[in-house]
Amino acid sequence: MEHTGEMDNELAQQPTTPEGASGVARKDAPEQVLADTNEGSPDDAPEQQPGASTPDDATRPTVIVMHASVGSGHRSAANAVAQALELLRDDPSLRDGVPCPEDLNVEVLDVLDFGRMRMNGDKMASMFTGPTRPIYDLTWRYTLTGRLLWAGGTAWSRIMFPRFTEHVRKTKPLAIVCTHITAANVAVGARMITGQSFPIVCVPTDYETEGMWPHLHSDLFCVANESMAETLRPRKVPEERIAITGIPARPAFRKTYDKAAGREKFGLPQDKRIVLALAGAYLPTPYVRFREALDKMLPYLHRFKNTHLVIVAGADAEYAAHLRRECEELGIPNATVLEYVEGMAELMAASDLVICKPGGLTVTECLCAKAPMILLGRAYGQENINVRMLTSLGAALHVTTARELVGAMGHVDANPAIVEAMLTQGSFLRRPNAAIDIARNALRLAAAEPSTDAHMRKKHFLHFYWGHTPAHIR
């Protein structure tokens, strides 16, 4: 699960508004800021926001897409799947033979809104980005990832989330799609308690599967790549319950953009290498060191005559003003500072290289936009796995300090072919239609006969089991 890397091109640079540019209205939490994307184009979302409810919803067949607001990546993935479900509902030509109710209702829910105690996902995310990061790294890598494994149970639902169980009892969903482990476990518990037979689809939003997913009580895992499937097989997840779909990105990242037109739109030079730094921060803590490294790199930008740096500061006007002062004082002509950007997918597609943190949704969007990456900062937990996966394939460079960042940019400046090589290697992971594929799988399962696997439907409070030797060393 990814808690930290998505605060740059999601809520990271979003202005505080009741709905956001193309966000999803979350039932049961109208008072919260709902902005989820920096993609402000009306073409990127249906006129009716996905998940928005109407008085008739109670009588319509419903698919629930559930996330946890710990960071913004899980929410962004949930929104992408919800938009894909609505697209399939409204355009039968995209269904590929999968049945879909014409009056399908899609609910996008934050599982934390159903807790006995009100939980602040942003504060929870800080545990994974502050001084406790090494502890989190150990727990993420080693908790129930060996031979002793977690299957699922009702504990989460009975102790913390009985309200969601009642919502499921009333709604009787066709299916539940979960982009966070808490959501998945609560969905499994609700199904056990209510005795319903709807399928549960798990969608990890990083490039490895952690140990707390309800492995034996989920109907399908939609994973990013074959390596994740290799992780699930020794955990006794049957092959027919694994689909390699990719990580769901927003609709804007399914589009193809003209690079020259994009540069003209954002006022960027056509004859330079555009390096885009995603430095916006909805939660500032994870980006303190990231921004410090960018600040220290600025004085060396004079060296790279063929490079034009674009820094996105998001909704942080104070940080944007600081960057502009620095560039002016240093006399840097080859830099542009942007605040809130409408059309982030187009901006990324207009760039040759992106400097970013290694969050699952961030790197997925870079892959979809065909933008090679320099991953900046020490990586822990799921971000460490993302770094290892991307660098091992040659799809990204990884640096941890400003000195290494300057060196990497110099290396790219002296060897431009590196960028093209990273782009080629990244194409093996690029799956811009992941959200559509996940939506099709969810609808296919919803239309099929319920599973007759007695073990998957059996009630447990806490269900642990023994697996085979893990496929990957953590």
Region spans (language model):
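Acidic donor-binding loop of glycosyltransferase active sites
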Residues: 349-359
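C-terminal "capping" alpha-helix adjacent to the active site of nucleotide-linked donor transferases
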Residues: 393, 400-417
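A short alpha->beta transition loop at the rim of the catalytic pocket in nucleotide-sugar-dependent
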Residues: 351-352, 370-372
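Donor-nucleotide binding loops and adjacent catalytic segments primarily
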Residues: 261, 269-350
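A nucleotide-sugar donor-handling region in carbohydrate enzymes
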Residues: 219-284, 314-318
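Conserved N-terminal ligand/cofactor-binding loop architecture of enzyme catalytic domains
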Residues: 79-171
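C-terminal amphipathic helix plus adjacent low-complexity
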Residues: 417-474
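Active-site and donor-binding regions of nucleotide-sugar-utilizing enzymes
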Residues: 77, 92, 139-236, 241-244
